[in-house]
Regions:
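Charged, terminal alpha-helix-loop-beta segments
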Residues: 1-159
Length: 161
């Protein structure tokens, strides 16, 4: 029996830029559905590059369950303090209850910061950290995979209700 081999694909080989390639791709309905499946949340797009004062948040969605705002901030690199600050400012400016940080790789201190935020905030706020990967088998198209690295403490029990 012959089986294919998984081969990891560099994110920048598919998405050269975050703003012009990755964000529009993620905002497409099928791709938001894939992200939503990973989170256990049904998402509906409200906008891309949404103004927050003089700045722009990557993606704003709402949950279909309760119409609350979901902020999605993307980073096609290793997480950094700048994006952590942007996440907080955009979440406050857009009154987001669910905050999703998608990155190529999470530094441990940034994962710990999201875990801490999940511990200290009220139950209506949820912080997620996801690493995005791309994989191929042979000459197949690249396939995305979202890996949850940080989630609310009660997240698993909430999505099974």
């Amino acid at each position: 029996m012959s089986l294919g081999r998984l081969r990891k694909v560099e994110l920048r080989d598919i998405w050269a830029t975050e703003a012009q390639d990755f964000t529009p791709w993620l905002a497409e309905e099928d791709n938001l559905n894939l992200l939503g499946e990973t989170l256990g949340i049904e998402l509906e797009l409200k906008g891309q590059e949404v103004s927050v004062g003089p700045f722009r948040a990557d993606i704003l969605c709402m949950t279909l369950a309760d119409d609350t705002n979901v902020l999605i901030e993307n980073q096609l690199e290793r997480t950094d303090h700048t994006h952590l600050g942007q996440l907080m400012a955009y979440a406050a400016g857009l009154h987001s209850a669910t905050i999703v940080w998608v990155a190529a790789k999470f530094q441990e201190d940034h994962r710990a910061a999201l875990d801490w935020l999940n511990e200290i905030t009220q139950d209506e706020f949820q912080f997620f950290g996801l690493e995005v990967e791309l994989w191929k088998i042979g000459d197949s198209p690249a396939a995305p995979k979202f890996n949850v690295v940080s989630k609310p403490n009660d997240w698993l029990s909430l999505i099974h209700i």
